[in-house]
Amino acid sequence: MEKLLWCSLVMIGFSQAFAQKDMSKTAFVFPKESANSYVSLEAQSKKTLKAFTVCLHIFTELSTTRSFSIFSYATKNSPNEILIFWSKDRGYAFGVGGPEVLFKASEIPEVPTHICASWESATGIAELWVDGKPKVRKILQKGYTVGTDASIILGQEQDSYGGGFDANQSLVGDIGDVNMWDIVLSPEQINTVCVGGTLDPSVLNWQALKYKVQGDVFIKPQLWP
């Protein structure tokens, strides 16, 4: 009986653990609107951040229909510690530590789209790049430090640490090539990543990704080069 209980506990532990996998040429597919389907990511680095860059591919038809979350990084002190969010009729909202700036756009084209967002504490400069092309720079949270022990979620926006999901803000579509660095990538580096190059990501590495899938999320081949 004790042996059976021990085996059961081991199996539960495995089911709750983060898998690590090379996700090259694959994508997470969110096929329907939901408040309980998402992917949790585990950061390779647990340190606080004075700068960062997040890059990813997204493929969705939602942008002219409603708003949705692209990348959600929460800490216990701030559910929107880092947030990349599509705001219908407004554009890309990029938040650090709660406050956000808006990069205007009328839609996300209904083709696979590459997005990079970067920020640095020293100047507060926030940048957004779409398919290798920059938006006008903004200023955001100069002097701020991004916290650690993060809950990183794809597919949902966190209104609380690891939860508080709203189906009306969920992603429907594909997301992949999610990488994150603890530096601001240069324009040349952004363009290298945009065309499929690798730059040894220090926080999230798509080629050695630690993740957990919850609900109706599937891993399928990428629909972009």
From Swiss-Prot:
Q: Which cofactors go with this protein?
A: Ca(2+)
Q: Name one GO molecular function term.
A: identical protein binding
Instruction: List residues binding Ca(2+) 2.
Output: 157, 159, 169
Q: Which SMART domains does its entry note?
A: PTX
What's noted on cofactor binding? Binds 2 calcium ions per subunit.
Q: Which InterPro entries match?
A: ConA-like_dom_sf (IPR013320), Pentaxin_CS (IPR030476), Pentraxin-related (IPR001759), Pentraxin_domain (IPR051005)
Q: Which Cys residues form disulphide pairs?
A: 55-116
Q: What family name appears in the similarity comment? A: Belongs to the pentraxin family.
Could you describe the subunit structure of this protein?
Homopentamer. Pentraxin (or pentaxin) have a discoid arrangement of 5 non-covalently bound subunits. Interacts with FCN1; may regulate monocyte activation by FCN1.
Which named protein is this? C-reactive protein
Protein species of origin: Mesocricetus auratus
Gene coding for it: CRP
